[in-house]
Amino acid sequence: MEQIEFDYTQPINDEWKKIMEKHLRTAKTFEIHCWNEETTWIEYALKYGTLKNDDWQYGKNIVGLVSTDFVNMVLQLPKPKDTEIYNKMTPFFSIFLDNGFSSEHYGTELNQQ
């Protein structure tokens, strides 16, 4: 796995969005992970996918197709304001794409397999 370097301490998420856009272009499916208490974001992600049946007791996984609507949603998300623990780039804890790309820990870690 190769870590993609970028400055996740930025006050805006433009660089994160630019990297996401590049990788979304070649992806066909996604999987989003949210913690159980992130109900607003679980409901939001469910507009673009369905709940994956798994045994993760601490959260929910949403899977779906990388459609134009999904890409637009990801790229138009505002940078979260709750940045005390993480300087969040996205409200989603993890976003995995079928092309091996992942945005983890609220977008502070980007990886490519």
Please name every model-derived segment:
Residues 1-113:
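Structured alpha/beta or helical-core interaction and ligand-binding surfaces enriched in interleaved
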